[in-house]
Every structure is written in C-alpha cells, then in structure tokens.
C-alpha cells in the first residue's frame, strides 16, 4: 500500500461525512513530513467550519493549509520541490480539479485528495467520481449510522431536525448540526414541495 514510486500518483480518500476522511488525509500528510518530504496542503475557501488556514478533522487534529477559492489557484504556487500535495474537501471544486490533479501527478507529485463521494441525496458528488477513476489508489471509509449503529455510507442532511428535501441546494457547508452519518436503510431524502399532490 505504501510502496516507493518513482513517478507521481493520485490517492483518493472518500466516504460519508464523519467517516474520517480528513483524519486519514492528515495522517498520510504527517507521514510524509516525518519522512522529510516537502508537503503542501490546499483547502477550499468555502470550508471555514473550523479554521480558514488549516485542515481540521472532526476530532480536532489539524494541519496547516492554503485556502483557495478555485482549483486553478493551486497552479499559481511554486510546487517545484514539493513531494506531497494534499487537497481536502475536493468536492467543493469544479471539474477543473481533475485535470489539475492529473497534471500534478504527471509532474511527479504524490497527490492525495479527500472528499465526499455522494451528496446528501445519495447521488455521486462531482468531481469525486472522476477523481476516483483517475486515482491509483482509492480508500472508501465508512462512519457509524447515527440511527442504528451499523456501517454508514451516506450523509444525512437535517434542516431543523428533519430530512432535507430532494430539491434543496447541493452545497451547504455544515458540521454535526446539519449532517449525520446514516446507513442505506436510515438515509432519508424528503420529496420536493413541488411534488405534493393537489387535493
């Protein structure tokens, strides 16, 4: 799993919220630092739940990060002597992130991306499916269902304690007050108000 490579490659860490994606990203990046590799970390500006200039896991572990508004900003940084590039919450970037990550790996960097594979509706969360496809290694983590305690692969969005509607906005940054992990059986997406039958 942790072989020495002579060229760049892409690692993808994915799963539902609270599955430990950021924790695993931080762990891998710290291993790189311990191995005396130069590590640079990026995160989207939209994710300011815990800290603007750090990737922070839900249990409080953190690593310094560069806050960027769009994927193309990665290429404005001097990455010449960088060995490992980490990118957290990658689902908040547009499809341009895929070609950027491929370019970085082609240039010899080990690129580690972390993000949600499904949105709150249980549908693929772009651009993660494309990143998973071009990655040499994909790690899919699971959380624990907040309802029954079984393995959880879905993210339940709650608005005022009730399941979000299918036509609610895809991106709504939150933490445990807005989301919880759920298994397939307990994941609920409420119908649109527009779908209610007229009486």
UniProtKB/Swiss-Prot annotation:
ATP binds at residues 15-22, 88-91. The keyword NAD does not apply. GO terms for cellular component: cytosol. Keywords: ATP-binding, Cytoplasm, DNA synthesis, Kinase, Metal-binding, Nucleotide-binding, Transferase, Zinc. The keyword Disulfide bond does not apply. It is found in: Cytoplasm. SUPFAM superfamilies: Glucocorticoid receptor-like (DNA-binding domain), P-loop containing nucleoside triphosphate hydrolases. It comes from the Bacteria. GO terms for molecular function: ATP binding; thymidine kinase activity; zinc ion binding. It catalyses: thymidine + ATP = dTMP + ADP + H(+). Its EC number is 2.7.1.21. Zn(2+) binds at residues 145, 148, 183, 186. Its main location: cytoplasm. One of its GO terms (biological process) is DNA biosynthetic process. PROSITE patterns: TK_CELLULAR_TYPE. Homotetramer. PANTHER family: THYMIDINE KINASE (PTHR11441), THYMIDINE KINASE, CYTOSOLIC (PTHR11441:SF0). Belongs to the thymidine kinase family. This is Thymidine kinase.
């Amino acid at each position: 799993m942790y072989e020495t490579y002579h060229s760049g490659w892409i690692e993808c860490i994915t799963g539902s919220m609270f599955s430990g994606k950021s924790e695993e990203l931080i762990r891998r990046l710290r291993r790189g630092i311990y191995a005396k590799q130069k590590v640079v970390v990026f995160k989207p500006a939209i994710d300011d739940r815990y800290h603007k200039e750090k990737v922070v896991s839900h249990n409080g572990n953190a690593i310094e990060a560069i806050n960027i508004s769009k994927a193309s900003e990665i290429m404005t940084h001097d990455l010449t002597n960088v060995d490992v590039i980490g990118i957290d919450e990658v689902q908040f970037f547009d499809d341009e992130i895929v070609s950027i990550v491929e370019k970085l790996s082609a240039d010899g960097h080990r690129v580690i991306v972390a993000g949600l594979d499904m949105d709150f509706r249980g549908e693929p969360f772009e651009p993660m499916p494309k990143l998973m496809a071009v990655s040499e290694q994909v790690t899919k983590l699971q959380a624990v269902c907040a309802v029954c305690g079984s393995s959880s692969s879905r993210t339940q969005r709650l608005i005022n304690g009730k399941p979000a509607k299918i036509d609610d906005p895809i991106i709504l940054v939150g933490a445990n007050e807005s989301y919880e992990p759920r298994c397939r059986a307990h994941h609920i997406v409420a119908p649109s108000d527009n779908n209610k039958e007229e009486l």
